[in-house]
UniProtKB/Swiss-Prot annotation:
Native source species: Bos taurus (Bovine)
Summary of subunit composition and partner proteins: Part of the core SMN complex that contains SMN1, GEMIN2/SIP1, DDX20/GEMIN3, GEMIN4, GEMIN5, GEMIN6, GEMIN7, GEMIN8 and STRAP/UNRIP. Part of the SMN-Sm complex that contains SMN1, GEMIN2/SIP1, DDX20/GEMIN3, GEMIN4, GEMIN5, GEMIN6, GEMIN7, GEMIN8, STRAP/UNRIP and the Sm proteins SNRPB, SNRPD1, SNRPD2, SNRPD3, SNRPE, SNRPF and SNRPG. Interacts directly with GEMIN6 and GEMIN7. Associates with the SMN complex in the cytoplasm but not in the nucleus. Also interacts with CSDE1/UNR and MAWBP. Interacts with PDPK1. Interacts with TRIM48.
The protein, known as: Serine-threonine kinase receptor-associated protein
SMART domains xref list: WD40 (SM00320)
Chain spans, region Disordered: 327-350
Length: 350
């Protein structure tokens, strides 16, 4: 029988998980940060989901979170009208950046010297993190609250999305280069540096555009409203999740749906591939993060594939090296998504 998905579940949040981001690969592996309406962003080991720490200091829902490339700094965007920068090693708050309204999105430059923010006041702000007392540079032009803002093209350009528009800006001149208009709300945006690809979701559509010109490349239609999508680092697969609680996996080249399965017990708000492409993470209204294998049955992280000769001649089956727990909801997902037997119900406790 074909093996299918059973995820690792990362518990600890008490409200919906609305954003997540991976660091780059460091000498210590890679890391995962999550933003949650409980106001307590969390840092985890990326390949296992093991909880490392919680960043304490926000006084409202945290809408956006990111890590710099080497996972030494974190940044968060919150409903308390602030963005914060943190030491991701010690957990200490390094600076608080006051805004005039709710902040929704944050992104570091590649050298971690500048932070880009956006939110409900419709302004993009660029902070020089080496001069925390200096006023930020501001870019105006959006006509509604900014949902996502990202550096692109080696930090020479900026991509930003509001309700129904995606805009491309020149960093040096602070002027708009081009914009894309949609007939419905843009739900998410992801930038892939290799190949300069922009992934945009709106309605049931997953669209791919050139990040340099905003010209269309291709698009897929999903069976349900999609809130987030992510492109595999080697551009093999696309994963997406949305309002029907399901995760969808597509072949990027052909657009063929390869898998679909129940992923959570609430709408899925965010999906991202790990930097090595071995797994992807999803965050949901149900308050959990879940980690999924890109190739099921492969030995990786907490997953271990038992070969036939190691298992009394039976078919190979994935096992998870993790203490046994009793979580009924994961058993339900396992029964729906798997034709194989797993050694335990995985759970990461924060």
């Amino acid at each position: 029988m074909a093996m299918r998905q059973t995820p690792l579940t990362c518990s600890g949040h008490t409200r919906p998980v609305v954003d997540l981001a991976f660091s780059g690969i460091t000498p210590y592996g890679y890391f995962l940060i999550s933003a949650c309406k409980d106001g307590k962003p969390m840092l985890r080991q990326g390949d296992t989901g093991d909880w490392i720490g919680t960043f304490l200091g926000h006084k409202g829902a945290v809408w956006g979170a990111t890590l710099n490339k080497d996972a030494t700094k974190a940044a968060t965007a919150a409903a308390d009208f602030t963005a914060k920068v943190w030491d991701a090693v010690s957990g200490d708050e390094l600076m608080t950046l006051a805004h005039k309204h709710i902040v929704k999105t944050v992104d570091f430059t590649q050298d971690s010297n500048y932070l880009l923010t956006g939110g409900q006041d419709k302004l993009l702000r660029i902070y020089d993190l080496n001069k925390p007392e200096a006023e930020p540079k501001e870019i105006s032009g959006h006509t509604s609250g900014i949902k996502k803002a990202l550096w692109c093209s080696e930090d020479k350009q900026i991509l930003s999305a509001d309700d129904k528009t995606v805009r491309l800006w020149d960093h040096a001149t602070m002027t708009e280069v081009k914009s894309l208009n949609f007939n419905m709300s843009v739900s998410s945006m992801e930038y892939i540096p290799e190949g300069e690809i922009l992934v945009i979701t709106y309605g049931r559509s997953i669209a791919f555009h050139s990040a340099v010109s905003l010209d269309p490349i291709k698009s897929f239609e999903a069976p349900a409203t999609i809130n987030s999508a992510s492109l595999h680092p080697e551009k093999e697969f696309v994963v997406a999740g949305g309002e029907d609680f399901k995760l969808y996996k597509y072949d990027y080249n052909s657009g063929e749906e390869l898998e679909s399965y129940k992923g959570h017990f609430g709408p899925i708000h965010c999906v991202r591939f790990s930097p090595d492409g071995e797994l992807y993470a999803s965050g949901s209204e149900d308050g959990t993060l879940r980690l999924w294998q890109t190739v099921v049955g492969k030995t990786y992280g907490l997953w271990k594939c038992v070969l036939p000769e190691e298992d009394s001649g039976e078919l190979a089956k994935p096992k998870i090296n993790f203490p046994e727990t009793a979580e009924e909801e994961l058993e339900e997902i396992a029964s729906e998504n798997s034709d194989s037997i797993y050694s335990s119900t995985p759970e990461v406790k924060a």
